Amino acid sequence: MDNLNLNKHISGQFNAELESIRTQVMTMGGMVEQQLSDAITAMHNQDSELAKRVIEGDKNVNMMEVAIDEACVRIIAKRQPTASDLRLVMAIIKTIAELERIGDVADKICRTALEKFSQQHQPLLVSLESLGRHTVQMLHDVLDAFARMDLDEAVRIYREDKKVDQEYEGIVRQLMTYMMEDSRTIPSVLTALFCARSIERIGDRCQNICEYIFYFVKGQDFRHVGGDELDKLLAGKDPKE
């Protein structure tokens, strides 16, 4: 379900400006998705060259965030958008902030992997790689949903985070077992726990982007809402009922 309609303005230039910003967001999203995928690969394969490329590439992500942010400020000042147009611009501003933070996670994963892990830690990395791929797919899907402002898909992705949380909890239990069985693994396990938590937070970031889609489509703030209450709000019902 595509909820975008950018061909309604009297000013064709306004349409072009909105479309340009949306295109930049999707470019940034694709860049961050690739950064994250490469970071997971670099960590799992202990590929130092790939890790260094990811670290270097984070600068480009940061530059894109600044450029899109400035474009949004200009369009607000120049066009004074209202209603759905304003919601779209605000959703974009918030979404690029989430994408920038996901890019930071990719950077941190690579820096940590370069400093702390070696081939002897491979068993610790297998589960992290699986969790990482799960969040990469989640990011891919939420970017697709954002491009179309697809409410139904955003709801599905929002709920997918529960599976990411469950996978993360399983990894924590596994890593705690490693530490109890061999105290010599404590430093590397603590590093793996840090990476696991960072990856799990990507799922939360994707949930936040889903909330911005809800906000654009429904015109209502869905932050800090979950479970049955979320279902009622999306259906247009009073959550107190």
UniProtKB/Swiss-Prot annotation:
Pfam families: PhoU. GO terms for biological process: intracellular phosphate ion homeostasis; negative regulation of gene expression; negative regulation of phosphate metabolic process; negative regulation of phosphate transmembrane transport; phosphate ion transport. Keywords: Cytoplasm, Phosphate transport, Transport. It comes from the Bacteria. It is found in: Cytoplasm. Its main location: cytoplasm. Belongs to the PhoU family. This is Phosphate-specific transport system accessory protein PhoU.
